[in-house]
């Protein structure tokens, strides 16, 4: 009788084949796991295990210079009739709720100006993972000390009564402002040392020394500013901060007092880095602040203390 050579194989003959299949399955499983992990690390909700406040994927030069970050953004208007202590405004916030709460920033306009003058910062910062409130002041003629109080009143409304309060970590807050709003930013940081970040943009204030400020502060001046010249405003503000405070001075090149009123990549880049570093305690952004940025086509000068202590 003719025998079939493909039947009745020896008992151990299948083992190498099975081992090969198992190895291939293990390799595929590992590859899938790697893809899943990579997706987790690079998606909008990526967070490092040792810092629960990190939001968004690892930053790059291009990501912090982009017009929009990884988060989709919505906005809601706040009527001046619905609030006390400031003039209402617009809240910009990430639509995602899967990442937990976000830090928040309130931004005040300058003398005679409205929130529209700094509105570009709202979606730009919010898309990087912040709740941002651009406000109007009670009157356009309000002075820096009044604007400082209004920034704090807006923060209190944002965290206590606003429709997005559940999206905010009330322990991670910052302030920004332009011109007299920038002077108000320093006033707010002086009054409330629990603030995590302050960014005065081409600031104006009659008070030149700020020894009481312990909040990490980035002062932004402009080399062509004739309304608040850096020699009598931004530079002494920076120098008047305690050396123990995390501080930096960024002087824009070929810029004016009104440069913060239109979309500006340099302002956005370093504001995002400062807010991320100190509100989110996200050291992934330290690389853009330390070593100190060098003079360039957009930077006239940059000073600061590195590495940062906070």
From Swiss-Prot:
Gene null: resulting phenotype: Deletion of this gene results in reduced BHET degradation.
Enzyme type, top EC level: hydrolase
Enzyme Commission number(s) of this protein: 3.1.1.-
A Pfam family reported for this protein in Swiss-Prot or TrEMBL: PETase
Transmembrane segments: none
Record carries keyword Hydrolase: yes
Keywords: Disulfide bond, Hydrolase, Secreted, Signal
Cellular compartments per GO CC: extracellular region
Catalysed reactions, as listed in the record: bis(2-hydroxyethyl) terephthalate + H2O = 4-[(2-hydroxyethoxy)carbonyl]benzoate + ethylene glycol + H(+)
PROSITE patterns named in the record: TAT
Activity-pH dependence: Optimum pH is 7.0.
Superkingdom of origin organism: Bacteria
InterPro entries: AB_hydrolase_fold, FrsA_esterase, PET_hydrolase/cutinase-like, TAT_signal
Coiled coil: none
Record's comment on post-translational modification: Predicted to be exported by the Tat system. The position of the signal peptide cleavage has not been experimentally proven.
Signal peptide boundaries: 1-48
Active site, UniProt feature: 179 (nucleophile), 225 (charge relay system), 257 (charge relay system)
Gene Ontology molecular function: carboxylic ester hydrolase activity; hydrolase activity
Entry keyword Hydrolase: yes
Localization per Swiss-Prot or TrEMBL: Secreted
Disulphide bond pairs: 290-306
Entry function: Catalyzes the degradation of bis(hydroxyethyl) terephthalate (BHET), a derived-oligomer of the plastic poly(ethylene terephthalate) (PET), hydrolyzing BHET to mono(2-hydroxyethyl) terephthalate (MHET). Shows no activity against PET.
Classification via PANTHER family: DIENELACTONE HYDROLASE DOMAIN-CONTAINING PROTEIN-RELATED, POLYKETIDE TRANSFERASE AF380
The protein's name in its UniProt record: Bis(hydroxyethyl) terephthalate hydrolase
